[in-house]
Amino acid sequence: MRIIAGNWRGRPLIAPKGTETRPTADRTREALFSMLVSRLGTLDGLRVLDLFAGSGALGLEALSRGAGHCTFVEQDSAALDALRTNIAKLGAAPQCDVRAQSVMALGPAIAPYDLLLLDPPYRSGAGVVALERCLRLGWLASGALVTVETA
């Protein structure tokens, strides 16, 4: 697993130990971000919210491509270890906020986000619930884009 493009292109990422998470494949991330850049023109300066963040591959890819900030939300301890290691290895800490909590425990937003990256556990229904929660609690800016990975 690696960063596909941008400032950290080719830099390796570690995956969480165990079988609780399944990182988004490089090819899938490449296709997703190609679509996002095609739609937006650039990710420069965007505020990104990466829910069910796992290793952080999606949010870190956004930062590598110019996003200004990413908040990662993850509750699994192995995934958090991998996420924090990946952030440190890239020197990305100033642009990151890591929240070690359940996505379902998010309170009202302090400021809205421009891009929501949702990669919930497959067949859990958590993606729909998380999106509804983000909308209700003001996490999404007007015109924000949302991506959801499902099985």
What is each stretch, according to the model?
Residues 1-151:
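Class I S-adenosyl-L-methionine-dependent methyltransferase catalytic core
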